[in-house]
Amino acid sequence: MCGNPAVGNGTRALILVGGYGTRLRPLTLSTPKPLVEFANKPILLHQLEALVDAGCRQVILAVSYRAEQMEKELKVEAKKLGVELIFSHETEPLGTAGPLALAKTILAASSEPFFVLNSDVICDFPFKQLVQFHCNHGKEGTIVVTKVEEPSKYGVVLYDENGCIKNFIEKPQEFVSNKINAGIYIFNPSVLDRIEVKPTSIEKEVFPEMTQQQELYAMDLTGFWMDIGQPKDFLTGMCLYLSSLRQKQSPKLYTGPGVVGNVLVDPTAKIGEGCRIGPNVTIGPDVVIEDGVCIKRSTILKGAIVRSHSWLDSCIVGWRSTVGRWVRIEGITVLGEDVIVKDELYINGGQVLPHKSIAASVPEPQIIM
């Protein structure tokens, strides 16, 4: 790979899929988080497509939770993409580094560098640039860093003008940097000698040692980035993704009567008359939107129905859920799978578990079980 900047067929990647997806409940009570649709496509499929586009032919999924469902659904997609998917099963949670050691025989089978990424990340994936940057500096690892508005919420990365990382500072109270770890890495196989098959944090246990030895570099990400592991960030990420689509692939966006701004609609969805859809809306397969509905900054998942004259803002409507007539939903409300909201109700910030029927308004954010 480093001999050939055009990323060869020897490229491999490991995606950290492990966790239970608790931050994205109630959606993840029905579906493993990597299979939840983001902009009408499973989160993980965005990453797989970007890896394949960069020449990757083998992807290891480090899984622990509901692996069978993922295998079943992803094998079909992998075949279409022409990528070999290997499932590496954790019997106990191994953190962010342990899964690399568990997959060591596969990752060390070639001397070429390999990608590692966190399954919650959506961005303009820079895999080709990352390979070139990594090969140019010739050290053991490179992490992608991205600029954020509020660095005090994160651990920040300090590095010199060449990209050589000098330090990591966890949630700084005073401004030292606004660059954070974006959860996308490339490593030489020699990094595997630093990791054992046990619960290990790559950020807290492996990176500091590599930094001390000047073996870890940072590459700046251009374009948008979001960790979409929780509903608020899922919706923000959707807005950023649709904006990127507008710049790069605008024909994919929906244009029709009543559409405002960036909207993505599956061809099988039906939208009634007198609706106002957008900005920043995704509507999935087999969705029915009746007449006079207003939707903005929301995701409507497969098979959901929104009855006439309802108003939705900043919400996620789960698979096969039904929103009644003259309903108002806002405040980062998430309806799980197969939820029924009766007519003329108000829901503000509700997290509604699957298969529930809501017959009274929910004026304050709460979990409805």
Swiss-Prot record:
Q: Write the Enzyme Commission number(s) for this entry.
A: 2.7.7.13
Q: What is the name attached to this protein's record?
A: Mannose-1-phosphate guanylyltransferase catalytic subunit beta
Biological process terms in GO annotation:
GDP-mannose biosynthetic process; larval lymph gland hemopoiesis; protein glycosylation
Residues the record lists as binding Mg(2+): D120, D227
Family affiliation: Belongs to the transferase hexapeptide repeat family.
- InterPro entries recorded: GMPPB_C (IPR056729), GMPPB_N (IPR045233), Hexapep_transf_CS (IPR018357), Mannose-1P_guanyltransferase (IPR050486), NTP_transferase_dom (IPR005835), Nucleotide-diphossugar_trans (IPR029044)
Any one annotated GO CC term? GDP-mannose pyrophosphorylase complex
Q: Which GO terms describe its molecular function?
A: GTP binding; mannose-1-phosphate guanylyltransferase (GTP) activity; metal ion binding
Sorted keywords for this record are:
GTP-binding, Magnesium, Metal-binding, Nucleotide-binding, Nucleotidyltransferase, Transferase
Record comment regarding domains = The N-terminal substrate-binding domain adopts a Rossman-like fold and has a binding pocket for GTP or GDP-alpha-D-mannose. Substrate binding is coordinated by an Mg(2+) ion.
Q: Which reaction does it catalyse?
A: alpha-D-mannose 1-phosphate + GTP + H(+) = GDP-alpha-D-mannose + diphosphate
Q: Where is this region: Substrate-binding domain?
A: 12-231
Key word Metal-binding present: yes
Write down the required cofactor(s).
Answer: Mg(2+)
Q: What does this protein do?
A: Catalytic subunit of the GMPPA-GMPPB mannose-1-phosphate guanylyltransferase complex. Catalyzes the formation of GDP-mannose, an essential precursor of glycan moieties of glycoproteins and glycolipids. Can catalyze the reverse reaction in vitro. Together with GMPPA regulates GDP-alpha-D-mannose levels.
Query: Top-down, what is the taxonomic lineage of the species of origin?
Result: Eukaryota, Metazoa, Ecdysozoa, Arthropoda, Hexapoda
Q: Which organism is it from?
A: Drosophila melanogaster
Query: What are the start and end residues of every segment in region (Hexapeptide repeat domain)?
Result: 254-369
Q: How is its activity regulated?
A: Enzyme activity is reduced by incorporation into the GMPPA-GMPPB mannose-1-phosphate guanylyltransferase complex. Allosterically inhibited, when part of the GMPPA-GMPPB complex, by GDP-alpha-D-mannose binding to Gmppa.
User: Which residues constitute the catalytic centre?
Assistant: K171
UniProt subunit comment: Component of the GMPPA-GMPPB mannose-1-phosphate guanylyltransferase complex composed of 4 Gmppa subunits and 8 Gmppb subunits; the complex is organized into three layers, a central layer made up of 2 Gmppa dimers sandwiched between two layers each made up of 2 Gmppb dimers. Gmppb catalytic activity is reduced when part of the complex and binding of GDP-alpha-D-Mannose by Gmppa induces allosteric feedback inhibition of Gmppb.
| Key word Repeat present | no
Q: Which residues bind GDP-alpha-D-mannose?
A: D120, D227
